[in-house]
């Protein structure tokens, strides 16, 4: 009996955690190469969902810090779930061979082979086997951080975001990276970090690259440089990884109390447009669709009620029906519009439509029927000047 209970518990809990899968690929350029693929917690339970990817060089020791912050951020819906590809390089002289470059500062020998392996063999293998999205991040440390910059030398870079931690740069890289960034037109993110206690040569070249990037006029890319006081070559990684990931996904987070108070409530109009624009911009920036959060609908509803902009409840209803069809969400906003503008008969009919719809959080069928019942017998009083209502449910930091 205890064994059966253990097996049942194991099957139930297995789907709650990310899964690590060791992989081996027979490369035409490099022979056998091993790597680890980490799929997110929802991978098995959401078979239609696709995920952006993070390629971690020096995977033996960089995987854990990146996986940790991504799992934490995904729990709070601050960060998207991702597939992580961690390449093993820390045996013998492999990481140095993989990053080999010539006197001119370009990949050569085994470095050129590794460069092509990632784009021509590794990613095609991963894309075929796993449900991936085109948005790709690459991260590395010292030697491999310098190596990842080579992908910016291509006219159509393989990656959308670059995380360079204490980079050891090839000749002229501090100039070439900045030059390449001026010519790339697609959305791109570049993050660099150094530690005060690191080697002088690493910090000087990184500072020169930072200076070159900062003078680029009309930059079309996102850039952040962190120089950590008191950090060593190794301790800077723990400081930089959260900063880097949150830099790349800045704006992805749900509407916070600060955003609600300082931006949304201060609008004269266009509350629903604000919500629509937020998710349109996220899709444009990251190249994948993000389903609008229920907490964000609640935030916009609260702003509409606070500012008596009741006409905006109808476009909010349309937006809800688009993303949550056949649920009570859009119907609730429609009914609330009629109620707030004194059209009680229409409000009752709208509330009653929820009887055949799927409930969304607290907007249950009973909740909607009770709202309808409370309006029965009230004569219509159509008006656009209904009294203001102070919302009791403002957005919170915790979302489901």
Positions of the model-derived regions?
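Sec-dependent N-terminal signal peptides
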Residues: 3-14
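Long, low-complexity, intrinsically disordered segments
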Residues: 387-400
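Non-catalytic cap/lid and distal C-terminal segments of serine-dependent acyl enzymes
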Residues: 19-344, 348-383
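Absolute protein N-terminus
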Residues: 1, 18-19
